[in-house]
Design a protein with these regions (language model features):
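Short acidic, Pro/Gly- and aromatic-enriched capping/linker segments at domain boundaries
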Residues: 17-41, 46-51, 206
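Active-site mouth of glycoside hydrolases
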Residues: 32, 41, 52-278
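Sequence-pattern detector for short linear motifs
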Residues: 7, 69, 130, 158, ...
Length: 394
């Protein structure tokens, strides 16, 4: 298994000029700490959205769409047919649509995401791997020992290269709750962090933000919530691989929180491991009002102890596509933008949940509640993308 991955890496290292991402805090003096920067090959670092076609206030942001299921394969899915290769190709076919609307980054998970099988007629399984075939899901790029599955990584590399061609960025999630239990113990989780990061280095994937875990603080990770407790260690482990391997680049590393404010706390707490070792703050805003999100991003932006840019890289309002929800969705984008952060929309009904099909937006952004649901879902996605485009482009 390791041999196959290594051969894949040798074939591409040094091929072409890769787009590279960093935060201003990583680059140091003379750069804006809360901004994202890109460069082509050995060219100069420039803030994102720099150029005559962009609005000045867009510079340094990283607008995002969550495409968590882009490389997924549920190995226990027998109830319906699914081709993981064609699934990835559908995502690639949608990238130009995303880019022309100002999207620079997509979030993709090496352990999938909530497929909401329970909403279907034929698949009656839930997320936990530990439930076994017929009851749980097996969605993981990792083997139990922390090594990588070649087919998963081939799809991931293909997608990373297609993003690179377009000057776009891969937000790569390593671990997802309920699938971390694929890994047999905490040592295997450490090993998976190392192997995934080494894979990025070996394949010269410079257009990537590493997200160690999705909602690390949600309470659903296994082994005594190891990933949550060891977040600082895991971030340092990933960052250390670039030094250990003598890499010519270093990727931004963090993990996303669920955005909750616990009882008795006035502001959202950023874990010590992320505050002390992370390069940016990733958080989620699902189901929260625009004004709550505005307040939280503003608080984070104003806290000098918080590292790098602030990105809400997963956000949706109620998982419906009505006009009422659209108003709140666009209001969330506005609130985060006006507070200085970057925003990432989660197209929950369009393609996070099974059967992962509507990766492309509709041709019209006119949303009417009386529309057939599939048509309304696509129009809703188009309306969100058009709203983002108006913020990015002059």
């Amino acid at each position: 298994m390791f041999t196959r991955i290594l051969i894949l890496a040798i074939g591409v290292v040094g091929a072409g000029q890769a787009v590279e991402i960093a935060t201003g805090a990583m680059l140091g003096k003379g750069y804006e700490a809360r901004s994202f920067y890109l460069r082509d090959g050995a060219g100069p670092w420039k803030r994102t959205y720099t150029g005559s076609q962009f609005r000045p206030e867009a510079a340094g942001r990283l607008m995002n769409v969550r495409v968590a299921q882009a490389v997924v394969h549920d190995e226990w899915l027998t109830e319906e047919a699914f081709d993981p290769e064609k699934n990835t190709e559908r995502v690639i076919a949608a990238l130009d649509d995303y880019k022309k609307h100002g999207i620079l980054s997509i979030s993709v998970s090496l352990q999938g995401a909530n497929a909401a099988y329970e909403r279907t007629k034929h698949i009656k399984r839930t997320r936990p791997y530990k439930l076994g075939p017929g009851k749980g899901m097996s969605m993981s790029a990792f083997e139990p020992d922390g090594s990588l599955k070649p087919r998963w990584m081939e799809r991931t590399l293909r997608l990373a290269r297609e993003l690179d061609k377009r000057g776009m960025v891969l937000n790569l999630v390593y671990f997802y709750a309920y699938q971390d239990e694929v890994l047999r113990d905490p040592e295997a989780i450490d090993r998976a962090t190392v192997t995934a990061t080494d894979w990025l280095i070996a394949n010269n994937v410079r257009n990537c933000v590493i997200e160690i875990a999705n909602e690390y603080n949600g309470g659903d990770f296994d082994y005594g919530r190891y990933i949550e407790r060891a977040m600082g260690h895991l971030i340092q482990l990933a960052k250390g691989r670039f030094v250990e391997k003598g890499a010519a680049f270093r990727l931004p590393v963090s993990a996303s929180s669920n955005g909750e404010v616990k009882a008795g706390e006035e502001v959202m707490k950023v874990a010590d491991g992320i505050r002390d070792y992370g390069d940016l703050v990733l958080t989620h805003g699902n189901h929260l009002s625009p004004e709550v999100k505005r307040k939280r991003v503003k608080e984070l932006m104003g806290n000098a102890g918080i590292p790098g840019p602030i990105v809400i890289n997963e956000d949706d309002i109620g998982r419906e596509t009505t006009l009422e929800h659209l108003k709140l969705e666009l209001g969330s984008c506005d609130a985060i933008w006006e507070s200085g952060g970057s925003w990432g929309y989660m197209p929950w009904v369009q393609f996070q949940i099974w059967p992962f099909v509507d990766y492309r937006p509709g041709t019209s952004s006119v949303v009417k509640d009386e529309m057939p649901e599939p048509e309304r879902n696509r129009a809703y996605f188009k309306a969100v993308l058009e709203h983002i485009a108006k913020k990015i482009y002059k």
